Design a protein with these regions (language model features):
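Structural signature of tandem alpha-helical TPR/SEL1-like repeats
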Residues: 15-25, 50-62, 85-96
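Alpha-helical segment of the N-proximal tetratricopeptide repeat
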Residues: 2-32
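Amphipathic alpha-helical segments of tetratricopeptide repeats
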Residues: 31, 65, 98-99
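Terminal, low-structured helical/coil segments at or just beyond the last alpha-helical repeat
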Residues: 3, 82-113
């Protein structure tokens, strides 16, 4: 099974409440493709829902090191930091997410002209 299929299966498992299965599939995906941003993004969300906040933060930051301009990752990091009680970190991540959102909006506006 390729990384994309494994991530899709993991997301389905997660949506069905099978968190451990989703975590395993996503870990397997990252073994196969350690730089898969999609797998890291999904894994950070699964870990957060499992109350594995430190692990979720670690994976999310790893994904951001690969894709620093990924809006959804920055929003995820803010959510993780809120859960962790890191108000300053959450505010910083939220500010970065806001800027990334504006950049995306500007890029979309430029494409529509």
């Amino acid at each position: 099974m390729n990384t994309t299929d494994r991530v899709a299966e993991a997301i389905l498992a997660f949506s069905m409440g099978e968190d451990e299965k989703a975590e395993t599939l996503l870990q397997e995906s990252l073994t196969q493709n350690p730089l898969s941003v999609d797998a890291m993004r999904a894994l950070s969300e699964v870990l957060l829902s499992m109350q594995k906040v430190e692990d979720a933060e670690c994976i999310c930051r790893r994904a951001l090191s690969v894709a620093p301009d990924d809006l959804s990752l920055m929003v995820s990091l803010a959510r993780i930091l809120v859960r962790k009680g890191d108000k300053e970190g959450a505010e910083e991540a939220t500010s970065k997410a806001r800027i990334l959102g504006w950049k995306e909006e500007l890029a979309e506006d430029e494409q529509s002209y």
